[in-house]
A protein has these predicted regions:
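Nucleotide-state-sensitive switch-loop elements of NTP-binding domains
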Residues: 1-9, 14-17, 22-203
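C-terminal lobe/tail of nucleotide-utilizing enzymes
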Residues: 1-3, 55, 181-184, 188-192, ...
Length: 311
């Protein structure tokens, strides 16, 4: 499955199904095959550092040959996003407005959608990071991920609307000149800076949208366990992704019980079979990978090797 993988991959699904383990195993498999891999966690409940027993940050940390890992800190990412916005606004607005800019951003820090917007900026920068053959995202649970991946289209449209209003303002300025009025050069320079900033942001979001919706560039792998609730949530996630034109590469069914484990495990296997029948009725055409329920501790480097062999 993975050796023909797209350059950008997302692993997501219901909380607790093993997204981090599977995404890390995929990264190990590709790195061992000689590919340069960047593994990124966007889940606020980070676990990648625990697997490698390493302290990770927003900067790529080399953990193995061909494998670098990043854990995006939501609070730090939001603070950097707000700092960038403040720098841009201070450069474009008159000095008397600077205290108001600070007040507005302080209020915006905890507003709905701010965290998602900041994470989107970080993802948009990472998907184009040079030097890697594959960039793999270990995502937050389904609902957070669905909202995040729907944002590029919304943000591109929102920025486009701001640019249209900016153009209307510029037309008014040109009309004033035509009537013999004047427009201060500093104002015109600020207008040009605003246009340039909006254009850069729109291009960034459009670039991310183009990558996410290009099946040759990006695939999303849904991780689940063979249980009714994860199956139902995975079907909803599939609908959300495909409605946003994001290709689902596979369903990774994690922790599958053995068929020959005897009388004790037989009821568990029956529950799983029933859940997979439900999955078949909804997503029968999606490629599927089954990963067995392995003995021993799962969140270790040795466990990753065992899982990587099966991907």
């Amino acid at each position: 499955m993975l050796l023909e993988a797209a350059p950008v991959m997302f692993f997501g699904g219901k909380g607790g199904v093993g997204k981090t383990t599977v995404s890390a195993a995929a990264a190990v498999r590709l790195a061992e095959a000689g590919r340069r891999v960047l593994l990124v966690s966007t889940d606020p409940a980070h676990n990648l550092g625990h697997i490698w027993d390493a302290q990770l940050s927003d900067d790529p940390t080399p953990l193995e040959p061909n494998l670098d890992v990043v854990e995006l800190d939501p609070a730090a990412t939001t603070e950097r996003h707000l700092a960038d916005v403040e720098r841009s606004m201070r450069a474009m607005m008159p000095e008397r407005m600077h205290p108001e800019i600070r007040r507005h951003l302080d209020l915006a820090r905890h507003s709905p959608g701010m965290h998602e917007a900041a994470m989107l900026e970080a993802v948009a920068e990472l998907v184009d990071r040079p030097g890697y053959d594959h960039i793999i995202f270990d995502t937050a649970p389904s609902g957070h991920t669905s909202r995040l991946l729907a944002l590029p289209e919304l943000m591109a449209a929102y920025t486009g609307g701001l640019m249209q209003r900016r153009e209307q303002s510029d037309k008014f300025s040109r009309a004033v000149r035509g009537l013999g009025g004047t427009v201060d050069d500093p104002v015109e320079r600020r207008n040009q800076e605003i246009r340039a900033t909006l254009l850069r942001r729109r291009r960034k979001f459009e670039r991310l949208r183009d990558i996410l919706t290009d099946p040759a560039a990006c695939t999303f792998h849904i991780v689940l366990t063979a249980e009714r609730l994860p199956v139902l949530e995975s079907c909803e996630l599939y609908d959300d992704l495909t409605s946003n034109s994001i290709r689902v590469g596979s369903l990774v069914i994690n922790r599958r019980s053995p068929a020959d484990a005897g009388e004790f495990m037989a009821p568990r296997r029956a529950v799983e079979n029933s859940a997979l029948e439900l999955l078949d009725s909804q997503l029968a055409d999606v490629p599927r990978v089954e990963l067995p329920w392995l003995p021993g501790e799962i969140g270790t480097r040795a466990a990753l090797a065992a899982i990587a062999e099966r991907l």
